[in-house]
């Protein structure tokens, strides 16, 4: 059998393409190397990868706690991808927040996503967190922040607030059906009268091609058996860490795996009795500062760190603020899968600015200054490893005809903002292009 399209990956990109095309009378095959993850169990599937972060020589002697811990990169393997553990942040990645936003970057390459962003927002039920859903900790942060002159705005979320009980467990995987994730699209596909074939536990190793045209994919099934699937087109949505390896194995090497960014972040927090941030919708508001932003965020890592400083506390006694930056796109995924990256002085200065503002906000809220701690530097939004203008063109097509990419690897530089809405819009654009092309054949 020769499929019309093989879709690799079921995260925001792959699932959206599948959802857009499943009722278009096309012969689709959807592949994912992960399996179905039970509701509420997604956080246990998070994979932590070492991020070999080289730190440029510091311009001052300040010893920040977050520089003393190994940096980490977070990903998840399973149907739905990282959408399962997202905090439902639907950032539009527009220039009003950051002049080098994802949308601005795409415009340079004649890729305009305005209509697709609106369409994605409607389908994902995006809306700003309403004031009645903000918990006491978030409201207190807003109050103190505004006293200090910081503009705090509600975070756009892909949450159906009529179903949300404010449990604060978005990271675990929503069991209430309130938070959108890519499995919602996959369930729609499965319930279709004539659903496409879906194969889980299948690892694509390379794309087959002949004379510059796609012929299918090769990979291994859950039992380790090598299998070949034939198709006229292939859409890669395997994620910015996996897509480069598939491309390299498929004879596309120029600029592949280079330019990695991860939207690095830390969470700074301290002891504030019974603040109960852990029981609120996470990251309910944000304060924008161009290449970085601040948002209330509970991190379980902070509990033991604060205890180590002599404080007796429970999880409900932690107040935290996330600092997320648009880090420089200087990382690399090597052929053996190891990841290296440099934390530049520019990156560090952004963290320093955010750290100082966070400490100011925390102490204004009443956090004991002696308890203030910082998590390790982490990256949860890897991208840039197969960017538009280098590895793909404005139609998201590679040098192999019929091979497309629709994940964060095509974003050229770090937007410093959650990318799910952007990826969904990209996937909708690609889907529209494929409909037009296949409809004319």
Describe the residue ranges of each PLM region.
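N-terminal glycine-rich phosphate/pyrophosphate-binding loop and immediately adjacent elements
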Residues: 1-99, 219, 254-271
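Glycine-rich loop(s) and the adjacent beta-strand/alpha-helix scaffold that form part
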Residues: 20-23, 34-39, 44, 191, ...
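FAD cofactor-binding and catalytic pocket of flavoenzymes
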Residues: 60-62, 67-68, 73, 82, ...
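Rossmann-like flavin
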Residues: 83-164
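Helix-loop-beta segment of a Rossmann-like dinucleotide-binding subdomain
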Residues: 96, 123-128, 152-192, 337-343
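Helical element adjacent to the flavin cofactor pocket in flavoenzyme catalytic cores
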Residues: 165-232
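A glycine-rich dinucleotide-binding beta-alpha-beta segment and adjacent secondary-structure elements
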Residues: 166, 170, 199, 205-210, ...
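An active-site-proximal "capping" alpha-helix that borders the catalytic cofactor pocket
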Residues: 421-437
């Amino acid at each position: 059998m020769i499929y019309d399209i093989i879709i690799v990956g079921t995260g925001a990109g792959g699932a959206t393409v599948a959802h857009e095309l499943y009722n278009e009378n096309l012969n689709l095959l959807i592949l994912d190397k992960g399996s179905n993850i039970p509701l509420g169990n997604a956080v246990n599937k998070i994979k932590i990868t070492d991020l070999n972060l080289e730190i440029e020589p510091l311009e001052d002697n300040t010893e920040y706690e977050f520089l003393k811990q190994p940096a980490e990169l977070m990903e998840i393997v399973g149907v739905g991808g990282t959408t399962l553990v997202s905090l439902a942040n639907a950032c539009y990645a527009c220039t009003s927040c950051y002049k080098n936003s994802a949308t601005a970057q795409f415009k340079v390459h004649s890729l305009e996503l305005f209509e697709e962003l609106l369409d994605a927002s409607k389908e994902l039920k995006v809306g700003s967190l309403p004031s009645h859903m903000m918990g006491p900790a978030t409201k207190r942060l807003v109050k103190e922040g505004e006293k200090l002159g910081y503009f705090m705005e509600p975070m756009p979320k892909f949450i159906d607030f009529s179903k949300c009980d404010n449990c604060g467990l978005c990271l675990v995987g929503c069991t209430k059906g309130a938070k959108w994730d890519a499995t919602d699209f996959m369930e729609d596909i499965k319930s279709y009268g004539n659903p496409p074939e879906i194969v889980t536990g299948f690892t694509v190793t390379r794309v087959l091609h002949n004379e510059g045209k796609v012929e299918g994919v090769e990979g291994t099934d859950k039992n380790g058996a090598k299998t070949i699937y034939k198709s006229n087109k292939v859409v890669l949505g395997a994620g910015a860490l996996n897509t480069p390896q598939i491309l390299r194995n498929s004879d596309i090497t120029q600029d592949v795996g280079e330019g990695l960014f991860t939207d690095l972040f830390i969470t700074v927090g301290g002891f504030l009795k019974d603040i109960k941030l852990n029981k609120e919708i996470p990251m309910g508001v944000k304060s924008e500062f161009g290449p970085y932003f601040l948002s209330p965020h509970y991190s379980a890592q902070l509990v033991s760190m604060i205890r180590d400083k002599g404080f007796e506390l429970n999880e409900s006694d932690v107040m935290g603020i996330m600092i997320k930056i648009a880090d420089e796109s200087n990382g690399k995924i090597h052929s053996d899968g190891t990841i290296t990256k440099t934390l530049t002085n520019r990156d560090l200065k952004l963290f320093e600015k955010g750290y100082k503002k966070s400490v100011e906000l925390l102490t204004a809220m009443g956090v004991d200054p002696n308890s203030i701690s910082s998590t390790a530097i982490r990256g949860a939004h890897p991208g840039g490893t197969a960017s538009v203008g280098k590895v793909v063109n404005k139609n998201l097509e590679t040098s192999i005809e019929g091979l497309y990419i629709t994940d964060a690897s095509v974003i050229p530089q770090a937007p410093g903002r959650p990318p799910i809405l952007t990826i969904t819009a990209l996937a909708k654009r690609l889907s529209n292009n494929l409909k037009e092309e296949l409809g004319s054949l």
